[in-house]
Amino acid sequence: MGNILLLDNIDSFTYNLVDQLRSNFHQVFVYRNTVRKNIILKKLSKMINPILILSPGPGNPDNAGCMPQLLMELKGKLPIIGICLGHQAIVKMYGGHVGYSGEILHGQASLINHDNKAMFLGMSNPLPVARYHSLICSNIPNMLVVNAHFNNMVMAVRNDYEKICGFQFHPESILTTRGTEFLQRVIQWTKI
């Protein structure tokens, strides 16, 4: 069981993610990105071994409320998992680029290829996932391992030392057929 603070980037998928996590017996506290950073930091300080999950959301990570400041404050201090917009914010924080992907996807099932390591160990390869995005990460800095891709587009990154990872795809979507199992593996990875 994990103690999770989920930062809601005002996305319609947020509570699908909350339900998926709670159905696997994780304790989940939800705060919107419009809440002041200090309030969220105070809550995290009272949690035992917290994990921060950055939800999907609209727009660019620079305009996602307190998320960029939280990332800078918490990097290396606790495990952080970013999904879609959260993933983009992680890559940007490390110095990568976030830009238009050339297409707008809203509910596209894709087969991604992965490195079969860490959270992907033992997962089918290619792995069917759901993609909902128009932005994509590139120019990934050396501190991040690109551990999944689709047609040369980055679909997942991780930093094993700082226990930070991000996914462009949505594990909480029904189109990610093994999404619940994958999310469980990610949470286990944060504890290794």
Swiss-Prot record:
Positions contributing to L-glutamine binding: G57, P58, G59, Q88, S134, L135
One GO-annotated biological process of the protein: L-tryptophan biosynthetic process
Species per Swiss-Prot/TrEMBL record: Buchnera aphidicola subsp. Baizongia pistaciae (strain Bp)
Coiled coil: none
Name under which the protein is recorded: Anthranilate synthase component 2
Subunit structure: Heterotetramer consisting of two non-identical subunits: a beta subunit (TrpG) and a large alpha subunit (TrpE).
Group of enzyme by EC: lyase
Glutamine amidotransferase type-1 domain sequence ranges: 3-192
Pfam families hit by this protein: GATase
Role this protein plays: Part of a heterotetrameric complex that catalyzes the two-step biosynthesis of anthranilate, an intermediate in the biosynthesis of L-tryptophan. In the first step, the glutamine-binding beta subunit (TrpG) of anthranilate synthase (AS) provides the glutamine amidotransferase activity which generates ammonia as a substrate that, along with chorismate, is used in the second step, catalyzed by the large alpha subunit of AS (TrpE) to produce anthranilate. In the absence of TrpG, TrpE can synthesize anthranilate directly from chorismate and high concentrations of ammonia.
Catalytic residues, chain numbering: C84 (nucleophile), H170 (for gatase activity), E172 (for gatase activity)
Top-level taxon of the source organism: Bacteria
TM region positions: none
Pathway terms, separated by semicolons: Amino-acid biosynthesis; L-tryptophan biosynthesis; L-tryptophan from chorismate: step 1/5
Catalysed reactions listed for this entry: chorismate + L-glutamine = anthranilate + pyruvate + L-glutamate + H(+)
Molecular functions (GO terms): anthranilate phosphoribosyltransferase activity; anthranilate synthase activity
Key words, A-Z: Amino-acid biosynthesis, Aromatic amino acid biosynthesis, Glutamine amidotransferase, Lyase, Tryptophan biosynthesis
PROSITE patterns hit by this protein: GATASE_TYPE_1
Enzyme Commission (EC) number: 4.1.3.27
GO cellular component, one term: cytosol
